[in-house]
């Protein structure tokens, strides 16, 4: 990549959550292999983000590459309206087999945010078909569900990336974020505000939507499984649907194939994305029960009113099937358990820094929450200098490495985090 290319990028290309007047620096990557990104300079960076939590098997995995190459020769895309194909059937068969019962109807879409939009539309259309006007969603503060309009309406309205849009979005119901931690005791009083909100608005609520066990980009909080059990019971009692957004947590990230398994519950609607294709292509899936699907289909519209152009893309479905085949081997369980053990041991020293508020770990997730926002540009430059790729935001420095990472590579990541949090120059104060 030339200097001219980088100048063009800076002038014309809008990167995620980046200013066009004072953009953060970008680092040109030429290729990626295993757990490493190779910069144009030849410098290698150990990958700590799994490309926003998606590349669970690392990069250039031979089985995933082979699946894509074979599918390209047959058919890279075809519309899904009035047509079906083997990769979609194979993928949906696998998804129905591995997700909790009674989820059995699958809607394929483009991205995680769209999966959430689809789930919300399913819930709204379900109640419309039943002749009830339920138009609101109940969720937690500090939640994050995506950047599209409906998804933004169930993100924290005050403490998130979407507070700018308050007043424009539909007004949903927000309970305080869970305080009972995964590694602590369950406090029954923790759920009281949530229960009061549900009781007060039970005839308005179409669904509860939440990120099970781990709240992702809204704060990386890890909460007690009893929350999910109690909410499942409340939803059953009130006849309210439960949507589990497992876009970040699905496919083994928390040590269980799906985070709902920590509580032994099943949602009425399940959102999947990110790691669905092993981080190779964009694809998402929204699963629901036969009862929800048939209620929608028997309503006035006679069908579910959604249909993306690239729905069921054969290339994405083929590589997603290969990804699930890799997961079926079960090797990921030991990999994630080993990562968790190493993260717990090696991030513990960060707690001694005066700039650190909390350290938390679950599965292949390690989070260091700081007392002050980090200086993003300076800290990113430091990490690249250390030969690691870690992308912090706000007060969070976190690791979500590929499951195939070696202990020595993970040690480089944790050492870089420990060095950073003991250096006050990286914090705004």
Swiss-Prot record:
Recorded coiled-coil stretches: none
Subcellular location: Cytoplasm
This enzyme's EC code(s): 2.6.1.62
GO biological process, one term: biotin biosynthetic process
Keyword set includes Cytoplasm: yes
Binding site for pyridoxal 5'-phosphate: 112-113, 245, 308-309
UniProt cross-references to CDD domains, sorted A to Z: OAT_like (cd00610)
Main location class: cytoplasm
MF term (GO), any: pyridoxal phosphate binding
Gene3D superfamilies to which the protein is assigned, alphabetical: Aspartate Aminotransferase, domain 1 (3.90.1150.10), Type I PLP-dependent aspartate aminotransferase-like (Major domain) (3.40.640.10)
Pathway: Cofactor biosynthesis; biotin biosynthesis; 7,8-diaminononanoate from 8-amino-7-oxononanoate (SAM route): step 1/1
Keywords for the protein's UniProt record, in alphabetical order: Aminotransferase, Biotin biosynthesis, Cytoplasm, Pyridoxal phosphate, S-adenosyl-L-methionine, Transferase
One Pfam family matching this protein: Aminotran_3
Enzymatic reactions: (8S)-8-amino-7-oxononanoate + S-adenosyl-L-methionine = S-adenosyl-4-methylsulfanyl-2-oxobutanoate + (7R,8S)-7,8-diammoniononanoate
Name listed for the protein in its UniProt record: Adenosylmethionine-8-amino-7-oxononanoate aminotransferase
Gene encoding the protein: bioA
